[in-house]
């Protein structure tokens, strides 16, 4: 029974976090427990525990005597998150390349293929589901680092990546051929085990996405 409760709690945690990342729950939105029980079909005690955990992860603010609200956004926070992502993802990618094996390379090729299909379809205006596109983008970047052989590093990268992704969903513009080319170069240099070139492309990719996010936003 305890395991079942934990599973329900984890599932609800992921649903609420996803809604914050995707902008369904926008910055500074009040999170009223009674309303959330209907939306997420969870008890008040479970929701309170989940919101406290999300506060610890930086997605929610816990306000004394005022309850919970979605964390605010700012350019300062965005730049800090972007720099942290570069630091963490670069290190994890280096370790993944050092531990390179056939199974990981196959997963990487598969993740990139799915992302490339989505991006090419968007480029040719055959597809415009940006949520699915960013989920495939996330899968590719998570696969890049998963072979680092450090569970803590993978979890830390996922947390920072999700925070960065939240900002992208506030504007969510597609950079077209530039994004496609950067992902291809990142794949190629990684498979060639050329960390220095892969790291350079990764850093440029993140900073260009950052500039795009800042320029297109009037939210923060």
What do the PLM-derived regions correspond to, one by one?
Residues 21, 25-26, 160-174:
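A short, hydrophobic/aromatic-rich structural module that often spans a beta strand
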Residues 1-98, 218-220:
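Short linear motifs at protein or domain termini
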Residues 102-169, 181-188, 197-208:
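Conserved amphipathic alpha-helical segments that form helical-bundle/coiled-coil interaction surfaces
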Residues 74, 101, 193-194:
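Acidic/polar helix N-cap motif
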Residues 1-2, 196-220:
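C-terminal effector-binding regulatory domain of bacterial HTH transcription factors
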Residues 52, 97, 145-149, 211:
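Amphipathic alpha-helical interaction elements
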């Amino acid at each position: 029974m305890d395991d079942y409760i934990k599973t329900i709690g984890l599932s609800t945690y992921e649903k609420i976090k996803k809604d914050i990342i995707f902008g369904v729950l926008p910055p500074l939105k009040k999170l009223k427990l009674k309303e959330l029980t209907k939306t997420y079909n969870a008890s008040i005690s479970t929701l309170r525990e989940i919101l406290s955990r999300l506060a610890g992860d930086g997605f929610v603010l816990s306000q004394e005597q005022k309850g919970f609200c979605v964390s605010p956004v700012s350019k300062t926070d965005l730049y800090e998150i972007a720099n942290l992502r570069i630091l963490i993802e670069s290190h994890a990618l280096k370790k993944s390349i050092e531990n390179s094996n056939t199974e990981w390379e196959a997963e990487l090729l598969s993740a990139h293929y799915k992302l490339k299909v989505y991006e090419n379809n968007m480029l040719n205006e055959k597809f415009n589901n940006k949520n699915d596109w960013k989920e495939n983008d996330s899968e590719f970047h998570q696969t890049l680092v998963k072979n680092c052989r450090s569970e803590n590093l993978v979890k830390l990268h996922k947390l920072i990546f999700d925070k960065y992704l939240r900002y992208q969903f506030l504007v969510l513009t597609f950079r077209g051929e530039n994004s496609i080319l950067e992902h291809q170069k990142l794949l190629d240099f990684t498979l060639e085990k050329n960390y220095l070139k892969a790291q350079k492309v990764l850093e440029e990719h993140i900073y260009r996405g950052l500039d795009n996010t800042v320029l297109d936003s009037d939210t923060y």
